[in-house]
A protein has these predicted regions:
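C-terminal motif of bacterial Sec signal peptides marking the signal peptidase cleavage site
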Residues: 14-15
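Sec-dependent signal peptide recognition
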Residues: 1-7
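Hydrophobic beta-strand scaffold residues
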Residues: 109-111, 289, 323
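Active-site mouth of glycoside hydrolases
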Residues: 25-192, 197-207, 217, 332, ...
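Aromatic-rich peripheral "rim/lid" segments of glycoside hydrolase catalytic domains that contact
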Residues: 300-353
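Active-site region of glycoside hydrolase catalytic domains
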Residues: 132-265, 272-297, 318-321
Length: 353
């Protein structure tokens, strides 16, 4: 493992200095490589002391020491607010604590509103798109969240409006995105806002994203989990739960595959080609690009997994794309276990010198 402070400037002037809430806000948000703090304030039933103990300052110290420069921090509505929109004091205290730790370590934060009561990307019913009142509530959540954390400078903290929107029509997301962005701009004109396209922030749908005009404080984001046979190898929540074949990367993804999907060949060139849409949009608009999620399940074959991660990082570095792997600790995709024992090969691959 190693320490690396090299940054790709995502907006205006880069800064490696530590920041604190009372510093004047800038419009720079400089990141290169980070990790997702999943299953803490999002997608978790942990509460009380168990939740508080899951992610601590020791984690931030480790993240900084191995060369990451930021975290992406998913939060869920159900953890942060009750059904009437009242804040959960414990959850907001943990959030504030994490921001302080990151500031003290010189780390940046992408604060991601991950799951709403009205929108979970894998759910069949998503009232966010069918009930206007839910969209009003969504805007109110951002107003309250902004009020809670806006003291942190724009050079240290960015807002990701919503994780992996899934609407029947991409215009439903584009319209809500425009409304949310306009609202946030009335409170925080210089805050960096992270946005992605409809249908899971997929690279393949990026040309359907309507990006706010004349706003340079935008960070474009996509997620990448291809080839699925490798990244979600035998994942219990997917169609591959009972898959018994042998996966292979680079090359034909399933050894002795019998379907076109299983016989498809993946390598660094094919992966980069799949990212063409977001790369092209970012270049055309002169905006920075971020892969906010990518990863391979822990149970996948190690050699293939490391080869994939190595190729992904090479593509990101070639194209000036910042990135955050999914995810940091435990779960199905972690790069460290619950006792902070790292997968050294994985960490080194994600943080090359």
């Amino acid at each position: 493992m190693k320490i690396c402070c090299c940054l790709i400037t995502l907006l205006l002037v880069p800064s490696c200095s530590k920041v604190s809430p009372d510093q004047s806000r800038g419009t720079s948000f400089s990141i290169k490589r980070g990790t997702n703090i999943a299953h803490w304030l999002s997608q978790s039933t942990r509460r009380g002391e168990e939740r508080a103990a899951f992610f601590t300052q020791k984690d931030i110290t480790f993240i900084d020491s191995v060369g990451f420069d930021h975290i992406r921090l998913p939060i869920d509505e159900v953890q942060m607010w009750d059904e009437n929109g009242n804040r959960n004091a414990d959850a907001f205290q943990l959030l504030g604590q994490a921001l302080t730790w990151c500031s003290d370590a010189g780390l940046r934060v992408v604060l991601d509103l991950h799951i709403l009561r009205s929108h979970y990307f894998n759910a069949d019913e998503k009232p966010l798109w069918t009930k206007p009142g839910e969209q009003d509530k969504f805007i109110q959540l951002w107003k309250d969240l902004s009020a809670a954390v806006r003291e942190w400078p724009a050079s240290m903290l960015a807002y990701e409006i919503m994780n992996e929107p899934v609407a029947d029509d991409p215009e439903q997301w584009n319209q809500l995105l425009a409304r949310a962005t306009d609202s946030i701009r009335t409170w925080e004109p210089e805050r960096v806002i992270v946005i992605g396209s409809n249908r899971f922030q997929s690279a393949s749908t990026f040309d359907q994203l309507r990006v706010p005009e004349n706003d340079k404080n935008i960070l474009l984001s996509f997620h990448f989990y291809e080839p699925f046979h490798l990244t979600h190898y035998q994942a219990s929540w997917t169609r591959l739960r009972d898959f018994a074949g042998e996966v292979n990367y680079p090359g034909q993804i399933v050894v002795n595959g019998t379907t076109p999907d299983e016989q498809r060949v993946y390598n660094i060139d094919s992966l980069e080609k799949m990212m063409e849409k977001p790369i092209r949009v970012a270049k055309r608009l002169g905006l920075p690009l971020y892969c906010g999620e990518f990863g391979v399940i822990m149970k996948a074959p190690l050699e293939d997994k490391l080869a994939w991660y190595g190729d992904m990082v090479a593509i990101f570095e070639k194209n000036g794309i910042a990135y955050a792997n999914w995810n940091y600790k435990a779960g199905s995709f972690g790069i460290v276990d619950a006792s902070l024992n790292p997968d050294v090969a994985m960490v080194d691959t994600l943080t090359p010198e």
